[in-house]
Amino acid sequence: LSLKLEQHFHNWVSKFVPIAFRASKELTLDPLPGDAGFRRYFRINSQPSLIAVNSPPNKENNQSFVSISLTLQASNVRTPKIYAIDFKNGFMLLEDLGEQLLQPLLNHNTVDNFYEKAESILIDMQAVSADTSVFPEYDRESLEQELSLFKIWFVNQLLCSELKSTDEDMLKEIYGVLTENALCQPQGIVHRDFHSRNIMFMKSKELALIDYQDAVIGPITYDLVSLLKDCYISWPREMVIRRALNFKQRLQAKMFIENVDDQAFIRWFDLMGLQRHIKVLGIFSRLALRDNKPDYLKDLPLVVEYVIDVSTRYSDTLIFSNWFKKTIYPKFVSQNFFSQR
């Protein structure tokens, strides 16, 4: 932050910390680690502590964050309470959910219990009204735009590679398969980044969500595959499929979806994951190269594993799988960051 803006931010925070939270000592702002966006977070030494956020309005959609927060909270989805907001400058005062992310708590003994709770949040989210004035639609254009990041940032920029016109044609065909798969399944509220680093484990033992300002109306399997095929932690396929089908049963029991056979649901789920992970290869590359966040490179090998695994399983993505393994994978493993995982 510039010195002037920093002072303005500090003054705003001092002014708007609610009376009930004020400690006798002078308020201090302690910087916290950021996320993949441009927001900066600070813990305030109030009683109890609060989180101050500087979220540049030219980079982040703060209106969306607030309207989605209020909509989710109205359906008992746990997100941070908002105590004050300045839309013009992008300043916010939020409830402090603590420091415990779900990711470090996950192991083979704990995962089923935690994921059951996380999946319950996804079930609650399906009860949220799909209001297009709050949640944009995850339409064909959005899905295709995301997939285009793979070529631009992963293939061209990170691997310094160019595609032949036949490769471009093949990708267009595969993207069509993935987009149709996303649009043909039942739609509901989608967090869009529902994974172990965006779920907080609170002192109350509740799970709460963060980083949901990009939520949309989209495919019913999107958040499920983001959770079960997390880009930062992997589980055996047997467990992933068992949990996915258990979730399908819960959706059907609540009548959020009509009865669908297991094979069709897993195809929705797998190909939705393939769309997400092809996109993520582009996004992680962009975060590293454009936004100076090189740590994301060491998460690429797992995402590549997911891409190869699923594309090999389905006849209509096999051509992509063969091309990726022959053309892209050798260039990827020759990168110096590959051994970091």
Question: Can you annotate each of these PLM segments?
Answer:
Residues 31, 38-44, 52, 125, ...:
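Active-site acidic catalytic loop and adjacent metal/ATP-binding pocket
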Residues 65, 111, 115-118, 143, ...:
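Hydrophobic packing residues in well-ordered alpha-helices of helical domains and bundles
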Residues 142, 191, 216-220, 266-274:
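Secondary-structure capping and boundary motifs in well-ordered enzyme cores
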Residues 8-21, 130-136, 142, 146-190, ...:
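An alpha-helical support segment within catalytic cores of ATP-dependent transferases
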Residues 33, 37-149, 155-160, 167, ...:
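ATP-binding pocket architecture of kinase catalytic cores
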